[in-house]
Amino acid sequence: HNIQGIGDKHVPLIHNVMNTDFVVDISDQATNNLNMIFNTEIGKKFLIDRKNLDPNFVSRLPEFGFSAIANILASIKLAKYMDLNSDDAIITVATDGADLYMSELNKTIADFKNNYDEIVCAELFGQHLSGVSTDNMLELSHMDKKRIFNLGYFTWVEQQGVSLEEFEKRKDQKFWNSHYDYMLSLDNQIKEFNNM
């Protein structure tokens, strides 16, 4: 999806690839168009009047940026793929808000050349939310995980100077487990700082 920063072209160094079970692709078009629906008066009116969504809920949708929307769509795709139902749960994160993407919102609106209305909202909603499918997903085998892990070699070892030994350590779950206590200590330090 239309993300900005290191994650848009690289496998992040802090991603436990060997513990990843699925890769789910979300198109820029889906995140951009849903962002437009969630952040325009026409889109909000459509959601309230045509989809009967609570106005208070709709007023909170701008809290979802591109990555948050993509994570929600990926969760829907995974739920469909895994045949999950109302007795199951998927937990995801909303990592950003729409306020980070106002220039992108204006570009998306401009792409519709003044033809953006409730009919377009209905088409986009149906295509990108109601019509979410399980295409462009990969359930990872061990070899797939190794292949994705190795994609990071060029970025981190050759370009960023991470030692091969440090890079390779990340293949072992013990590496990630050893960082858990450190992460908890950081959480405590952050809490202490915030209470100052």
Regions found by a protein language model. Give the residues of each.
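Buried hydrophobic packing segments
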Residues: 71-79
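Active-site/ligand-binding loops adjacent to catalytic centers
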Residues: 1-63, 104-196
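Non-catalytic interaction/regulatory modules that flank or connect domains
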Residues: 80-87
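Glycine-rich beta-alpha junction loops
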Residues: 26-30, 70, 94-99
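A short acidic (Asp/Glu
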Residues: 75, 101-104
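Phosphate/oxyanion-binding active-site loops and adjacent basic polyanion-contact surfaces
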Residues: 63-71
